[in-house]
């Protein structure tokens, strides 16, 4: 009923406030991270669900065809020299973070997954970028590529890297 809708809206607003606060604190700290120690972490729902080139085991399987935004994110990762991992869920995300040992993370997800994930990896600095869900949750989601690029630009140690254009 109405009460349930109100509570879920409040929860997402609360999560959004937490994400905004953590993003703000990360930005205020002026981190300078070598690009290879920045992890771009995204959910597999960003990939077009009919695509046969699965990117969850190897993001370089992406053919950058333009049907979804995985290709655009891969371009950013290659351009700056960041790590880029696509995961199927929170448990795998936490495991991949442990393996990758990043000094900073740019995470793309919905409010719920971002809020819990940002808390789970503390004290690693995370910039959270909300995905957009035009087809509902967990299916063919999108993200503002410019927000992701801006996050990389904020975290990267500009004095010590060559851009791979």
Where are these regions (language model features)?
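Electropositive, gly/pro-rich neighborhoods at or near active sites that engage anionic ligands
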Residues: 1-38
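Short amphipathic alpha-helical segments
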Residues: 53-54, 98, 117-120
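Ser/Thr/Gly-rich flexible loops in soluble cytosolic domains mediating phosphotransfer, phosphorylation
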Residues: 127-165
């Amino acid at each position: 009923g109405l009460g349930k809708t109100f509570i879920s809206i409040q929860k997402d607003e609360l999560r959004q406030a937490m994400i905004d606060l953590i993003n703000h604190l990360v930005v205020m700290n002026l981190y300078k991270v070598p690009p290879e120690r920045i992890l771009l972490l995204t959910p597999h729902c960003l990939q077009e669900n009919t695509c046969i080139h699965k990117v969850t085991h190897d993001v370089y399987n992406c053919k950058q065809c333009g049907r979804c935004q995985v290709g655009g994110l891969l371009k950013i990762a290659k351009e700056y020299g960041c790590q880029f991992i696509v995961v199927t869920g929170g448990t795998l995300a936490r495991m991949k973070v442990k393996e990758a040992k990043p000094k900073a993370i740019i995470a793309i997800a919905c409010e719920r997954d971002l809020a819990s994930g940002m808390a789970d990896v503390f004290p690693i600095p995370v910039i959270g970028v909300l995905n957009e869900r035009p087809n509902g949750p967990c299916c063919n989601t999108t993200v503002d590529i410019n927000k992701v690029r801006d996050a990389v630009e904020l975290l990267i140690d500009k004095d010590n890297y060559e851009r791979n254009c």
